[in-house]
Amino acid sequence: LSAMRHLYEGLYKLDANSEISLGQAASVDVSDDKLTWTFTLRDDITWSDGQPVTAQDFIYGFDNLAAQGGDYCTILSDVAESYEAPDDKTVVIKLKQPCAYLPSILAFPSTYPARQDYVEQYGDAYATDPDKSVYNGPYEMESWAHESEVVMKLRDDYYDADNIQVGTINWELITEESSALASFESGDYVYSDMCPDEEKPRMEGNGLVYTEGDNNYCVMFNLGENGNDVLKDENVRKALSLTIDRDRIMAIRGLNDEIGVTLVCRGYVNADGTDFVDYCDPWEDTS
């Protein structure tokens, strides 16, 4: 996902401070009932082959997302009643109900625009090599040694290129956390998203910045037809829950975790700015 944010850009984007701001959209108008969002695209946005980015590219991207049926395929359709492009510069999204986090959805890579000609030409091979896609983000892919390295270079025609300081990014593809950490500590890497849990307190103690994603960890029971009949007893599941020493798990991790009592973790707020965890009913008293 981090790589995609460099190669492509949605109606919204994450700025230098990881705050959501307008990306390919120059402006947005929200109706009084907060159900209709009308985006006007920037005049200076192009694909890496020089063609202008159009509203239809976004509509095609939305449609293609739903048609693929993969991860996040309903991330937009869950909240959107419809979407359309009345002209090349306008994207209109109508919601089923007000959705304060729509900007977050539209900044997520799954809702980025897509060029129909490239998707149809390459099919399942689309975007598997640098020349099998075009890019509307700040960088374009220069090379991709599969399972080894991706090299990206800054696009001179990106609308905000003058404010980007890094001309080339090398992404090393590593699966071993210990190898990634060793390369980071030696200075070969300036950033890594892999770090063994047991090393995280030490890294923070050295003054380095470590950020944890919004994750929940839980035990899930199969209550379907093929599931264990014993586990379908609510009291059995509660008993198993009581055997989990949550405080001990947090102490072992040594991070700023908190006991999870909801499926949605802390950090998600409603339209009034109230955190969901603070106003929803917890599953169970875990004390």
Predicted regions, residues:
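Ligand-binding "clamshell"
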Residues: S77, K200-E212
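Surface-exposed binding/hinge segments that line
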Residues: D29, D33, T40, T74-V119, ...
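Structural transition elements
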Residues: D257-S287
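Gly/Pro-rich hinge or "lid" segments in bacterial periplasmic/extracellular proteins
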Residues: A107-I164, T168
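N-terminal lobe/hinge region of extracytoplasmic solute-binding protein
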Residues: L1-D32, D63, V134
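A bilobed periplasmic-binding-protein/Venus flytrap-type ligand-binding module shared by bacterial periplasmic
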Residues: R42, K153-D157, D214-A239, T243, ...
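Aromatic- and charge-enriched surface segment that lines or borders ligand/interaction sites
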Residues: A26-G69, P86, V92, S183, ...
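Ligand-site clamp/hinge motif
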Residues: D156-R202
